[in-house]
Amino acid sequence: MEPSEVPGQNSKDNFLEVPNLSDSLCEDEEVKAIFKPGFSPQPSRRGSESSEEVYVHTASSGGRRVSFADNFGFNLVSVKEFDTWELPSVSTTFELGKDAFQTEEYVLSPLFDLPASKEDLMQQLQVQKAMLESTEYVPGSTSMKGIIRVLNISFEKLVYVRMSLDDWQTHYDILAEYVPNSCDGETDQFSFKISLVPPYQKDGSKVEFCIRYETSVGTFWSNNNGTNYTLVCQKKEPEPEPGKPLEEAPSKQKKGCLKVKSSKEESSETSEENNFENSKIADTYIPTIVCSHEEKEDLKSSYQNVKDVNTEHDEHNEKELELMINQRLIRTRCAASEYGKNTLSSDPSNIPNKPEELQKNQSHSEACTDLSQRLLSPGSSAESSLKGDFYHTEKYSSGNESSHQPSDMGEINPSLGGTTSDGSVQLHISSKEILDDNANPAHGSGRGEISCSFPGQLKASNLNKKYEGGAENSEMKDCECLPRDVHLKASDYFKKSTENRPSEEDYGTSKDNKEKRIQLDVDEKTSKNFRSIFYDQERNVGHLEITVEGIEASDRDLTSLPTKDTTIPTWAIMEDTFHSSRTPLGREEAVLTTPEHDLSSSEGTILGGLTGGVCSPRNGNVLKNDYLFQVEKRKSGWINPEDQNKDTQHQQSWNVLESQEKARGSKTNIAEQIKEQVDCEDMWEKRDNTGSLKATPAEALFTCQEAEHCELSPLADHGIPGKAEAGTAYIIKTTSETTPESMSAGEKAIIAKLPQETARSDRPMEVKETAFDPHEGRNDDSHYTLCQRDTVGVIDDNGVEKESHLDICNARLDEMRKEEAMSMHSPGKMRDREKLGIGNITSVEESSQVIANNEKATSRLDLHLEMPSADKKIFPENRDLGQVQELSKKTDIDNTVHSAFNSDTNRASRDDSLLSSHHTETSVLSCEQANAVKNTVTTTALQTSATESEYNCSPTRETQGQPASKPEEVSRGSRRVTSETRKEKCVGQMFQSGECNVEMSQGPMILVSESRENVERERHENEGLINSGDKEFESSASSSLPVQETQDQSNESLLSKYTNSKIPYFLLFLMFLVTVYHYDLMIGLAFYLFSLYWLYWEEGRQKESVKKK
């Protein structure tokens, strides 16, 4: 083994540690390499003293080591290596020492200003949430200690200082430490330290940093108002001392020794001088260095006396500063500007070092006062009221040397130069709030003072609401736009606030109405204020109608602003205002809804006027069709006094109807609704233009029902559009007041537009599906009775007249045309159909007309349909059965009158029976309808147990919902068949129709047409059906026959059934006794139990079969 290798190893016994030194140098070089890419300030080089000591040891031990090598007989190769290493080591060592000494010749100079006073600091802190409060530069090093003050937003908080040495290409974060006992309840303090290490100690190098404040609420940044906090490394030129001139030593080592000796003395002096220069540059708060206000001599000559002078004048300076601050506050009535604060700090250390700076600051303060006086125009009421608000904007109102005004406040003052002081203050406050909102996302933003009296203020508030958190520069520029644009923005804003409501508000409580009314009031007031200032522009602008356009009818008391060009569309209200899940009716209403005062003022808009005030969803208690009917009557000039008395009645019935619509109405097809509404509107416009109120009954019924908005698709959208449109066009009918009070609301207002299953489940009647299937093969188009509004067959004594009104929202035009052709070419066949109650196409329409005159017979929904005046004359007098019969005869005589009881009463009863065949209660309803026609309001509740609404002209479910059209349909069907000759035929054919055989209720037939004797006769004929236990017959009999007789008969039948059912049990018991007597008790008991089980099972089967039947 070679001893030359032993020194290369890490051995504590060896004194020669040359390899270790080389390794350490390599490590230092590696550290430098690491510094360059990452700019990490962590490790520092080894001190000069340590390196020199190492060098001394190596030099002294070098000879010894060589001697040791020679003594042991080792080769001198290792010595040669040592010699080659020694030569560069000398120069390297002293270069390092030189670098180490040069680090003390660099200082950090700040390029930023700190808050001059506590008040200014707190003001900025409210906005930015974190601020650099003070800095301290460590003497003799390129390092800075800083204190950050943060707003105490949340308990958990972290403060980082992010710094970069290469213009933010790379950066790293320094975690600031909490200063103990620094919390004052509102703020906290954190400290940090930035050091510039030798590799980056270059003249002109910059250190940029900013502050990141992390809280549970959010993260906030402070970067010196967008310019970053910047430190510049500058080389400090050392000043030679007079008594110790530097010697020009020939050797580097000697020169280095001189420096080492003088470095400690110079370091203290140079560090103090450097700090003094720093105070001149930055005007920052450095507690160790104090500059005197009376400093007039040369700084170098008087440096030793500075501290004494400052201690003598401490109290004097404080008094002077207080006096100056008080004078300036009294003079300006606002806080001094940022520059004034820099000059007028309460701390003597921040007094300007030079008189020029003091004059400069005074000029800035004067500029601030001038600007504030300009802001405070002569019209300001109290200047002192602006003091607090101006604090928030003072630093932005005047120019700033550093030119770091916030972008959001830059242009407020110029834009409001001519406005009053109140306006400026209001805008300052709103802008301040915007800053707070931007800085702190937790607080809700969008504050705006609408109550201000001048327009600029309202502009600012609207801008605040619209552009929260955005760049406020653009907003303030927008303030200077034309008044007309601002007016448009404000009105748009209020329109949005009015229209953009959740769908529940369409049917909301009165609280919603109040809120909306208040909002509209505010809109009106602000609009009036606008008009007072910008009246010229506003007269040419029609946008104020927005404030009225989207308002429901419940807000009718609010009047729109009476501008010249304000034209409010009558029925073009947006459907979005009322879009909701209300019912098809609600949607349809919304399409034609307008404020009522607009409708009343505009005579030309008939459709809007008719539907406007009534159709809004919140006024559901008002019968919209009543309003339509009344307005139309007023225009036409004919009004039935009985109809006037019925207004309140129909309004009440409409409430019940609407409630059931909500419960049973199915979802509607919006596209079909809109299409049908357009068609209906066209129809209304035609009718309004022509003014023909004496149209045929079919047209009258159809147009009226269109006005009711009970269109086909909304009521019949069950996946079978054709069927639904055909069958369930106009189902909504309300019963007359003949129905007893004991009846439920569902009975009083029946919506026939239900699925067949629903109809069966909701009502005790059965509906034959064949009646509803248009493709079932029936040559009578009864299932389209309501839809076929264009075919109106009126049969007089002279013959059959055919009037067709085509293209009026027809569900199936082709089938109707076929039916029209059939009815025109085969009047006899149509008569047969009428006998069966199928051909009563126009009966519904005519019935609504006839009953319109009967106060207690039907609701006004059918009355809306324009009836011929002759029809009205028919039914006001219907009081008795005899009168009903007389009326039927009169209608036979009057060909012009297209109303109810022209035809045979038997035929009417047969029509009723047809209806009863389709649902069990129809017979009862038909009886009631007959009673309603007779106006027998005093009939017992049992007789009128079913509502008239169940009585339908046609057997289809479509007719189920037309409560008022029953007797009229009967009469109309009879009317179609020419007079009395056809009556007789109908009497004979009553039971001949196969569809009417069992379910035909003779009672209703009798009530409608025949005398009391006929009623009794037909009642006896129906007794057999009553005994059968059929619900349909029981309901019809109960409505037509005396209640006591029907009850007696039913009691007898029940008694007989009960006794019959108990006979088998009695016989079984006898058999049990016999078995027990002859056989064992257990056997008899088992046989008895088995027999009982079998009997119960059989009886249950029988009951099920009966139910099915």
UniProtKB/Swiss-Prot annotation:
It is a single-pass membrane protein. Residues 236-278, 340-424, 436-455, 493-517, 945-985, 1011-1048 are annotated as: Disordered. It is found in: Membrane. Skeletal muscle, diaphragm and cardiac muscle. A motif (PP1-binding motif) lies at residues 64-67. The keyword Transmembrane applies. InterPro entries: CBM21_dom (IPR005036), CBM21_dom_sf (IPR038175), PP1_regulatory_subunit_3 (IPR050782). Pfam families: CBM_21. The modification Phosphothreonine is found at T58. The modification Phosphoserine is found at S40, S44, S48, S51, S67, S843. The chain crosses the membrane at residues 1066-1086. The keyword Transmembrane applies. One of its GO terms (cellular component) is protein phosphatase type 1 complex. Residues 340-352, 360-384, 396-406, 951-963, 1035-1048 have a biased composition (Polar residues). Residues 236-251, 966-985, 1011-1034 have a biased composition (Basic and acidic residues). Residues 124-232 form the CBM21 domain. One of its GO terms (molecular function) is protein phosphatase 1 binding. Phosphorylation at Ser-48 by ISPK stimulates the dephosphorylation of glycogen synthase and phosphorylase kinase. Keywords: Carbohydrate metabolism, Glycogen metabolism, Membrane, Phosphoprotein, Transmembrane, Transmembrane helix. GO terms for biological process: glycogen metabolic process; regulation of glycogen biosynthetic process. The CBM21 domain is known to be involved in the localization to glycogen and is characteristic of some regulatory subunit of phosphatase complexes. Interacts with PPP1CC catalytic subunit of PP1, and associates with glycogen. Seems to act as a glycogen-targeting subunit for PP1. PP1 is essential for cell division, and participates in the regulation of glycogen metabolism, muscle contractility and protein synthesis. Plays an important role in glycogen synthesis but is not essential for insulin activation of glycogen synthase. This is Protein phosphatase 1 regulatory subunit 3A.
